């Protein structure tokens, strides 16, 4: 028995030694990616935060009468708690019905909401069109992305990028620390990956949800407006909406390129305000921040995926396991059809969500721990069916 124990200890120590050597090797190959992956594991921000300034908090009145049943709110709270949520906010009939922060979290807490950022980018593209920086969604992306002008990518329009049907190639998710996917997500030169992807398919032949289209759209926006992304976001959206500053994450001090396919860090209540903006067709108070016609475009089903508009998900048809793209086995679980047929939602990795249901005058925000088995039908159905 002692001999077996000694052998097991030796094997364990050998494994630790080999693992350490491998980590050192990876670090030598790409210290930025490896150190930032370590930061992710430790729950830290994998990059440099750049402030998006707020200036004015759109006021949200608290509900003075019951408009959602106590049973529905209790069920929503129980599901949220069971899934490690940090915040649950419910807005119904022009009033805040619930603003709850779970133990260990507060109103000021910022949860990384990953791809929810994509839907904010869609709003900004519309604002840039309203302001005349971009002619229309059917303009060639290569008018701004000159790197695409002399190859097959010159066929790609802004609309196709917004609908994730551009045909551009994209890196597959990989656990390999030095693979393209990790380079894109935590590396120090995001455009080296995103701007250099080739056209894999003809535009408008396949829906493929990925980070390449939105990242290149963000670059396009910077070039079209002549402004840094964080400044344009602040001046045209955040300062009219938000209570607190938010943060975009830059790839490096040298390149200073925000990751626009993810990584807009903001408090839950400001995400609620963005949801209310869509609910109100681009208007908050007396100010039309983005045109109503643009919001209608955002929430119109795209030809290749009726459950997707412009960088925003829709509940048009039921899919029990919603597919993101054909390269990935990852899906989003829907235990049942949405109770309402007009659900609009921002989808952030692991259950970060803003649900908007115009027919019920309802917005729901959930931020929290990453849950790979998040049920997209649960919260909106529980709450909607309890609406009085």
Give the role of each language-model region.
Residues 131-169, 196, 225-262, 266:
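Active-site helix/loop module of the DD-peptidase/beta-lactamase fold
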Residues 2-105, 130-134, 382-388:
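N-terminal leader/targeting segments and the immediately adjacent pre-domain N-terminus
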């Amino acid at each position: 028995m002692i001999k077996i124990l000694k052998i097991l200890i030796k094997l364990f120590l050998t494994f630790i030694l080999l693992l350490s050597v491998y980590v050192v090797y990876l670090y030598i190959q790409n210290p930025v990616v490896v150190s930032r992956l370590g930061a992710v594991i430790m729950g830290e921000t994998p990059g440099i935060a750049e402030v998006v300034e707020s200036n004015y908090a759109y006021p949200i009145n608290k509900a003075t009468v019951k408009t959602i049943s106590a049973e529905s709110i209790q069920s929503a709270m129980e599901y949220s708690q069971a899934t490690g949520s940090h915040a649950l906010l419910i807005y119904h009939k022009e009033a805040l019905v619930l603003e709850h922060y779970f133990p260990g979290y507060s109103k000021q807490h910022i949860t990384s909401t990953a791809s929810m950022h994509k839907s904010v980018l869609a709003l900004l593209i519309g604002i840039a069109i309203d302001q005349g920086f971009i002619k229309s969604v059917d303009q060639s992306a290569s008018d701004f992305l000159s790197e695409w002008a002399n190859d097959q990518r010159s066929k790609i329009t802004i609309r196709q990028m917004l609908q994730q049907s551009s045909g551009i190639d994209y890196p597959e998710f990989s656990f390999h620390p030095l693979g393209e996917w990790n380079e894109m997500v935590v590396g120090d030169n995001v455009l080296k990956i995103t701007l250099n992807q080739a056209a894999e398919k003809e535009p408008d032949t396949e829906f493929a949800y990925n980070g390449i289209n939105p990242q290149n759209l963000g670059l396009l926006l910077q070039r079209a407006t002549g402004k840094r992304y964080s400044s344009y976001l602040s001046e045209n959206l955040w300062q009219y909406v938000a209570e607190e500053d938010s943060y975009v994450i830059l790839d490096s001090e040298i390149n200073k390129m925000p990751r626009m396919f993810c990584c807009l860090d903001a408090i839950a209540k400001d995400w609620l305000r963005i949801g209310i903006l869509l609910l109100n067709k681009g208007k908050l108070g007396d100010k039309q921040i983005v045109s109503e016609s643009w919001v209608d475009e955002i929430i119109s089903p795209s030809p290749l995926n009726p459950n997707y508009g412009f960088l925003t998900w829709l509940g048009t048809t039921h899919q029990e396991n919603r597919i993101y793209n054909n390269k990935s086995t990852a899906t989003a679980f829907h235990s049942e059809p949405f109770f309402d047929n007009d659900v609009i939602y921002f989808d952030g990795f692991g259950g970060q969500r803003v649900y908007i249901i115009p027919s019920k005058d309802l917005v729901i925000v959930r931020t929290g721990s990453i849950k790979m088995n998040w049920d997209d039908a649960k919260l909106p159905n529980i709450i909607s069916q309890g609406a009085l």
